[in-house]
A protein has these predicted regions:
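Family-specific signature for flavin-dependent thymidylate synthase
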Residues: 1-157
Length: 157
C-alpha cells in the first residue's frame, strides 16, 4: 500500500468579463450609478458571476428596475445570505461558466434547459417580472398588421 497525502490544487477559475457584464446591464436598462457599483470588484470572480446571474433572474440590480422587487440587498454578503436562506441554490452553479441569453423566447430557453449537461440555468422569473415587462421578439417577416395584432394581444394580457 502506498502512503499518500491529500492535496487540493486549483487548476482553473472563473474569470468575469466586465465589458460583457456592462453590455447586459445596459441592455436591461440599469442606471450608470448601479452599473458602476456592480462592476466594482466584489469578492472573487466566481462570487461576482453568481451574484450577477441571481440578480438577472429577478432584475434586482437596483431599486425600481423591477416593480415587483421591493427590497434590494446591495451588499453581496447580505444578498448571498438571502439566496441561501431561500434555497435558490441554482445561481451558485454559475461560478463555472455563464451565458446571458437576452431577448429570446421561452421556446429557445426551454430547449437550452432540456439539453443542459453540466450547466446551470437561471431564467427570468415570470412570478416576479410582470408579463407586460417581458420582452419578446417579433420576426421581421411578419406583416405590419400581424405584428400590431401580436403586440396588442400581449398588451391586453
Amino acid at each position: 500500500m502506498k502512503n499518500v497525502k491529500p492535496v487540493v490544487v486549483k487548476i482553473a477559475e472563473t474569470k468575469v468579463d466586465p465589458a460583457a457584464m456592462e453590455t447586459v446591464l445596459r441592455t436591461l436598462g440599469v442606471s450608470e450609478a448601479s452599473i458602476e457599483r456592480f462592476l466594482t470588484v466584489r469578492g472573487t470572480d466566481g462570487q461576482m458571476l453568481t451574484e450577477f446571474a441571481g440578480r438577472m433572474c429577478y432584475e434586482s440590480y437596483e431599486p425600481g428596475l423591477n416593480p415587483n422587487v421591493t427590497k434590494i440587498r446591495e451588499e453581496p454578503g447580505e444578498y448571498f445570505a438571502n439566496i441561501l436562506m431561500k434555497g435558490d441554490g441554482s445561481v451558485i452553479e454559475h461560478g463555472v461558466v455563464s451565458f446571458a441569453f437576452l431577448n429570446v423566447s421561452r421556446v429557445c430557453t426551454h430547449e437550452i434547459v432540456r439539453h443542459r449537461v453540466g450547466t446551470a440555468i437561471s431564467q427570468e422569473s415570470l412570478r416576479y417580472v410582470r408579463p407586460r415587462d417581458v420582452k419578446f421578439w417579433i420576426p421581421d417577416e411578419l406583416a405590419p398588421d400581424q405584428a400590431k395584432a401580436m403586440t396588442d394581444a400581449v398588451e391586453d394580457i
